[in-house]
Structures are given as C-alpha cells and as structure tokens.
C-alpha cells in the first residue's frame, strides 16, 4: 500500500469514527424549544451550589434532546464517574436481557446455578430464594452478607442466614446484585461487562465502560461501574423509550415495565423518596418518577409524565436534599408545550453552566475508578 493510499484510508477511518461518535451523541437543543425554562434550570444550579456539597455534573434531557449540561471542575464531559449503586440498574438490565434470550427465568431458584457452592444442608428458606428475590432485594436476609477474600463471594452469600421467607422482607442488599452478576456469567459464559457490551453499551455509544471485579473474576454488579454523565443520560432515555433505541428494541418493553414498577414496599413516608417502593434494581420516586441511584448522589432520574431524564453525578452525603432541589427547582421547569425563545435567559444559563467548580474546601468522598491506582 502506498503512503498516499495509507493516509487516505486513515482519513476515511477517521471520518467514519467521528461520524459514528456523532451518531450516538444525544441531540442538543435550546431549553425553551423543548418546553423547558432556562431560568428554572439556572435557579436549580444556583440552589444546588448553595444547598448541596457538591454536584459533579448535571444533564437535563427533554423529548430526547439535551437542553442543559454542566460539569463542576475538575470534572468534565469525557471523564468517567464512578456510579456506586447506580451500577445495579445496569446489572439488572443484563438479567432482563438474559431472561429474554431464554437463559434463565426470574422464578429460577438461586441454588440452581451454584450447587457446588451451596451449604451442605441448605435451609428451606434458602431453597425458596429466587432470582426475582435478588432483583427486588427481598432475599429473606435480616442484614447484608459480608464478603471477604477468605471465601468465594457466592459461597459467602449462600452461607448467610435467611430468617425471613424470601419475597416478603425488603432489605437493601448489594451482595444480592453481585449474585445476579454471577448468575448472568454462569449462564452466558461472559462477565456482565462483556455481555452488555454488544447488547447495550455499543448500541448506546457508551465507550470504554469499566466495572470492578471480585477475586473470582465476576463483575461486582451492585457497584463499581464507571461511565460518563451522557452515558447515564442515554441509559435513562433508553428506559424512558421502553427499551427502544434508533428503532431497535434493545431491551424488552415488558422488562422495562416490571423493572421500574413497585415490586417491594420500602416504607410509608410520602415525603421520602426511599419510601416509594422498589422494582428490579430501580427505586420508585415521588411525582410518578423512578430512578437508579448510587452513594454520594449519583442519579439517573426518569420522569415519564414530563418525557424527561435527569442525570446527576455528585459527591454529597445528603441525597434526599439533592432530590428535593430537583423536585423544587427542575420539576417546575417542564412545560407542556414549547416556550417562546428567551435569548437573555439562555445566555445566563450557559454562563452559569460554564462557571462551575467543586469548592476548594470540599472533602472528597468518592472512590477510585476500576483499574486506577
């Protein structure tokens, strides 16, 4: 191949790569053209800076268009962010895809997949535990199993006492999500990260996702995934669209419906977003919304009634306060029809979003990305 021909081929590859990157990037639009108030978004940012220590990023989607996006320096658009337990919503999506492919059923007993790791005499309640109970965090445990390097994680989970009848007692349980990941790996021969790549990450244009693994080489599932803010937003938009992306059904709509509906009761306080119920690794919210969330304020909030998605990364200890600012300031920003153009307010919003930074005195709560040192 001549040098000129080689350069030409490289140019074509470059062009195709750029075109593909543009193709999977969400479209941008002015807030008012999508019925969203620029002023209200700006007031959300200003209030968040006053009341929340500290946001890292925010992206607001309306009718499939990004209408506002901002990063608190040193965070940036291309920098992946650790999702903590927001990872769970991605892991449960892998379970849904494996179910759709006939590789398992949510009513399969958990012990079916790990006979070699089962206790010598499993209890009747452990025998009753199903994949469905892992998804809804209703495993029957009184508290979370603890993992260590001294025993394989699956064996540790199965050795943990099950005092309650599975399916009747909600107990937040990250190891239950690890078990979902282990089951997907068992039935597909791939880690959840590998399994989701052609089915979810590649179609959505989620580039180079990273996921922490257990000592046994299983993606940890319930935490440890790192992606960019726009990737979170695209994931939420996929769910808002009932699993359809670019006219292709990536995730069955029936799974989306089950995963985001109330499957387990989590409390009775109408003012608390953690008391609105739990689906398949998604929380129900006030205002008929649902979300995936993770420690220190990671959110993928889906608002079907507003046809909107809000993606937020953060490093705060008061996640309810963070959601309160969303409901108080962002929710009223959405209007039923397009608003008159408002160049002045749009300019003020852009200026505010361009001038964000993490406070110098902020104490960092986040952990390192998978694979980092």
Task: Please provide the spans of the model-predicted regions.
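Active-site-proximal alpha-helical segments within enzyme catalytic domains
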Residues: 179-183, 223-244, 298-315, 327
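Active-site Gly/Thr loop motif
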Residues: 208, 256-310
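Active-site helix/loop module of the DD-peptidase/beta-lactamase fold
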Residues: 82, 101-139, 159, 190-227
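Bacterial N-terminal signal peptides
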Residues: 7-17
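Active-site SXXK
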Residues: 42, 64, 81-107, 134, ...
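Short, gly/Ser/Thr-rich active-site loops of penicillin-recognizing serine hydrolases
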Residues: 320-373
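A short, well-structured edge-of-sheet supersecondary motif
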Residues: 46-76, 307-310
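A small/polar active-site loop signature that marks catalytic segments
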Residues: 139-213
């Amino acid at each position: 191949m001549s040098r000129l021909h080689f350069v030409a081929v490289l140019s074509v590859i470059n062009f195709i790569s750029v075109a593909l990157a543009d193709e999977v990037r969400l479209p941008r639009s002015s807030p008012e053209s999508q019925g969203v108030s620029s002023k209200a978004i700006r007031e959300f940012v200003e209030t968040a800076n006053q009341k929340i220590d500290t946001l890292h990023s925010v992206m607001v989607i309306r009718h499939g268009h990004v209408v506002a996006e901002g990063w608190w320096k040193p965070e940036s658009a291309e920098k992946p962010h650790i999702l903590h337990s927001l990872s769970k919503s991605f892991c449960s999506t892998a379970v849904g895809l494996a179910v759709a492919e006939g590789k398992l059923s949510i009513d399969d007993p958990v012990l079916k997949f790990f006979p070699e790791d089962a206790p010598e005499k499993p209890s009747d309640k452990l025998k009753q535990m199903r994949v469905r109970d892992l998804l809804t965090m209703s495993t029957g445990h009184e508290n979370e199993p603890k993992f260590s390097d001294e025993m394989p994680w699956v064996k540790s989970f199965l050795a943990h006492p099950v005092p309650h009848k599975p399916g009747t007692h909600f107990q937040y349980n990250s190891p239950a999500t690890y078990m979902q990941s282990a089951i997907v790996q068992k039935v597909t021969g791939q880690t959840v990260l590998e399994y989701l790549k052609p089915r979810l990450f590649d179609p959505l244009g989620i580039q180079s996702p990273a996921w922490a693994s257990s000592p046994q080489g299983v993606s940890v599932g319930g935490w440890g995934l790192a992606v960019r803010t726009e990737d979170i937003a695209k994931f939420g938009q996929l769910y808002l669209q009932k699993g359809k992306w670019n006219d292709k059904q990536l995730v069955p709509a029936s799974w989306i419906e089950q995963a985001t509906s109330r499957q387990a009761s989590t409390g009775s306080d109408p003012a608390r977003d953690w008391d609105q119920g739990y689906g398949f690794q998604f929380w129900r919210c006030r205002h008929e919304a649902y979300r995936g969330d993770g420690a220190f304020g990671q959110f993928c909030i889906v608002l079907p009634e507003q046809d909107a998605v809000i993606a937020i990364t953060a490093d705060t200890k008061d996640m309810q306060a963070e959601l309160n600012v969303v409901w108080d300031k962002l929710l009223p920003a959405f209007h039923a029809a397009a608003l008159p153009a408002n160049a002045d307010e749009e300019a003020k919003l852009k200026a505010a979003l361009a001038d964000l930074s993490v406070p110098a005195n902020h104490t960092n709560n986040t952990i390192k990305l998978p694979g980092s040192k």
